[in-house]
């Protein structure tokens, strides 16, 4: 639900409560159990659901050919993933990070609209995402602990309050889009999105599980009116391949030992939808 208030002919504000739902499952992470504060709750426990709540506010202003908007959304406070309390920091807590942003749209011609916006995602507000992964020495110590059965050698066990995470930082997201209403039947759209990789190269190891390395993606699509009351929309998205790699070098008692981790990804997505007006 949304509550909106029109201040005057040009300015409006709105408020929405946000209800969150997450579902998670993990398989094949048995090797991570040796690094966990709760080894039985790391992997192969089926689906786990979490619910939560937050809030969002927004502003929209229209001034001739220009429209401007701004929004802010609180953290969405989620239930813990109790079945995976030994995987995510704070006993399975995995809140949705807060975000804020602003944008502008320009009606360049009667048919062409150009829009741009920027937003900030505050990953640092969620420990499961922002906690750093192990250094080389911490990993070698934990591996030694797993071999000899000494969990005290694991500096920040998975699932603990300071448990190892993905090391994500806050990021800025930039978007540019165009909308061209060719005629009453056809509308064409295109867009570009850029956001830096949210983690440093030395966090590549644990991000094998969540390789968010894509920085740029483009979209193109159209809407075709079939009848006065129905339409079909098609969108294609391509995310350009990006790579992150790092070689971890041990020091002190682990001098001479090393290992490497590499993350890479590209994406293709095609979406088709059909709409009806009642």
Residues of each region from the PLM?
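Outer-membrane beta-barrel porins/channels
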Residues: 1-278
């Amino acid at each position: 639900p949304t509550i909106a208030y029109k201040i005057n002919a040009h300015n409006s504000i709105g408020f929405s409560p946000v209800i969150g739902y997450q579902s998670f499952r993990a398989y094949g992470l048995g090797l991570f159990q040796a690094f966990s504060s709760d080894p039985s709750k790391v992997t192969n426990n089926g689906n786990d659901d979490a619910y939560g709540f937050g809030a969002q506010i927004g502003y929209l202003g229209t001034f001739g050919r220009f429209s401007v908007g701004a929004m802010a959304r609180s953290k969405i406070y989620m239930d813990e993933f109790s079945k995976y309390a030994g995987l995510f920091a704070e006993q399975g807590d995995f809140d949705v990070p807060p975000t804020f942003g602003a944008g502008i749209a320009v009606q360049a011609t009667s048919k062409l609209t150009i829009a741009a916006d920027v937003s900030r995602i505050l990953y640092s507000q969620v420990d499961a995402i922002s906690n750093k992964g192990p250094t080389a020495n911490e990993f070698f110590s934990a591996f030694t602990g797993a071999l000899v059965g000494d969990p005290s050698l694991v500096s920040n066990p998975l699932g603990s309050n300071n448990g190892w995470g993905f090391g994500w930082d806050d990021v800025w997201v930039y978007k540019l889009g165009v909308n061209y209403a060719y005629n009453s039947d056809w509308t064409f759209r295109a867009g570009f999105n850029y956001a830096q990789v949210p983690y440093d190269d030395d966090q590549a190891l644990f991000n094998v599980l969540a390789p968010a390395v894509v920085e740029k993606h483009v979209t193109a699509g159209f809407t075709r009116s079939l009848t006065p009351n129905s339409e079909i929309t098609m969108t294609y998205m391509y995310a350009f391949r990006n790579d992150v790699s790092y070689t971890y070098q041990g020091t002190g008692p682990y001098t001479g030992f090393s290992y490497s981790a590499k993350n890479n990804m590209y994406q293709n997505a095609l979406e088709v939808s059909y709409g009806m007006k009642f």
